[in-house]
Amino acid sequence: MNYCKISFYFLLSISLSLFLISLKFLLKDLVYFIEWEAWVFKSMSIVMTFLFDWMSLMFMSFVLLISSLVIFYSNQYMEEDYNINRFILLVLMFVMSMMMLIISPNLISILLGWDGLGLVSYCLVIYFQNVKSYNAGMLTALSNRIGDVALLLAIAWMLNYGSWNYIFYLEMMSKNTEMMIIGGLVMLAAMTKSAQIPFSSWLPAAMAAPTPVSALVHSSTLVTAGLYLLIRFNILLTDWWMGQFMLLISGLTMFMAGLGANFEFDLKKIIALSTLSQLGLMMSILSMGFYKLAFFHLLTHALFKALLFMCAGSIIHNMKNSQDIRMMGSLSMSMPLTCSCFNVANLALCGMPFLAGFYSKDLILEMVSLSYVNVFSFFLFFFSTGLTVCYSFRLVYYSMTGDFNSSVLHPLNDSGWTMLFSIFFLMIMAVIGGSMLSWLMFLNPSMICLPFDLKMLTLFVCILGGLIGYLLSNVSLFFTNKALYFYNFTYFAGSMWFMPVVSTIGVINYPLKLGLYSYKSFDQGWSEFFGGQMIYNQLKNYSLYLQEFQMNSLKIYLLSYMLWFIVLLMLVVLVN
């Protein structure tokens, strides 16, 4: 047995065990806080602390479940790769870093998991060794460095207090102005890791990694680390300005990602932007105070998003590494099993009734309708929901229907049983996971009382979004691309509001150009004129001038004596 199967059975067994334990913790409301003295030397001790409650155990079980299926899926997807064992070890290191982050109530150990995620994600993004992967890896690493610095500053600031265990200070953080600095730094760290505006550009760039990594990273590990950290610090968001600021940023991120996905043609980038949109949704509902609801959507989203990426990986695998949806078409005839699961995941993403996404998204929108939010935030929530249906319908229309648009030599069929097993397992979870979790997590159902038109607004927005997606995608012979009429808007929306340009060229090229301009203007310009050359010439002229006075000529001395004598004589005459 190779590393894939051993890791699969090991992680799956631990996942099922942790899920059952988390249910016991949830029903009995248990919390275990464990301190392990790792090293003691006289009066000094190094203590590792772990926090086990139903939230950490359930999240760990989902991370391990998806990781085990991703590793099993990789056994066939990466079978032609010479370094598959190295790949599996990197994925296991990634999972270990995530688990360290989940169970840590201490900012120091959180930083270990946080930095582990950043380092291993860089290694995975540059796994396919080419220039595009190197650029994407560097953008990912440098964007996440900002969050690492914020966490380090929070650790340094907590030196003013008694401990790095943040759970001791949560009540104090929301009331004490000095402790709110820690909250602001943690929020900045979460924004970078969960790719909120203005740190969104690294998330689509990270698609340079292998597709199994994308399924793991964008469902339950890297991008959700920041969100999970904020769920732990949720009491901070009860502060007015922090909650309002986070609501605005996450709402704009959700809207920007949904808009950008409608102008994208790369299959993996569309799903990545979909992840970004759902992260914005989770962040925004968390900033309104519904941390349990955000965690619920985090778990359901992990199921259908991992399924989406696995189906996309199977399609790319069969399309000989082509990711352009314009080159696809009629895949439902060639790959019926994969496309069926792909459609289930898409419907769950859109919030189709009784699938996983419905139980969380519908409840989120109902709670938004019940809450005191302004018109702008209300518009962002519902318009972004319509955009989700729009790009999902567009994706299905381009890839599943119509005629096949690629090479006729492509031998298209469903993948082997290894990949299909992981896909089918997640498909079952995407169907039953939402209802199961809602019954387990919310023992007391929420009382929703809304007018009929507000209750039906979600359904209306979804139908309208699907219709717009159909109209955007419906092309025929002699069709004029409407996007060309609004090219500036299309370019702006399709490039994530110019954020990748600002994050790369803006950070590198413009300072370099400013430095070149300064070098030309000052160092080789006025500084050269007023600097070395000018001083040299002036000193030379002064020295020549003084040299004339020191020639020791008797005629000059007599002349100067006579001139001064005449001047003094004239002064005496004038005075008298």
UniProtKB/Swiss-Prot annotation:
Record-annotated membrane-spanning stretches: 6-26, 46-66, 88-108, 109-129, 149-169, 179-199, 211-231, 240-260, 270-289, 294-316, 339-359, 363-383, 423-443, 459-479, 492-512, 556-576
One of the record's GO molecular function terms: NADH dehydrogenase (ubiquinone) activity
Recorded superkingdom: Eukaryota
EC assignment: 7.1.1.2
EC supergroup of this enzyme: translocase
One Gene Ontology term, aspect cellular component: mitochondrial inner membrane
Keyword line: Electron transport, Membrane, Mitochondrion, Mitochondrion inner membrane, NAD, Respiratory chain, Translocase, Transmembrane, Transmembrane helix, Transport, Ubiquinone
Subcellular location(s) of the protein: Mitochondrion inner membrane
Biological processes annotated in GO: ATP synthesis coupled electron transport; electron transport coupled proton transport
Lipid bilayer topology: Multi-pass membrane protein
Keyword Electron transport among record annotations: yes
Entries under InterPro entries matching the protein: NADH_DH_su5_C, ND/Mrp_TM, NU5C-like, Proton_antipo_N
Catalytic activity: a ubiquinone + NADH + 5 H(+)(in) = a ubiquinol + NAD(+) + 4 H(+)(out)
Family: Belongs to the complex I subunit 5 family.
Function recorded in the entry: Core subunit of the mitochondrial membrane respiratory chain NADH dehydrogenase (Complex I) that is believed to belong to the minimal assembly required for catalysis. Complex I functions in the transfer of electrons from NADH to the respiratory chain. The immediate electron acceptor for the enzyme is believed to be ubiquinone.
Protein name as it appears in the record: NADH-ubiquinone oxidoreductase chain 5
Organism (species): Anopheles quadrimaculatus (Common malaria mosquito)
Lineage: Eukaryota, Metazoa, Ecdysozoa, Arthropoda, Hexapoda
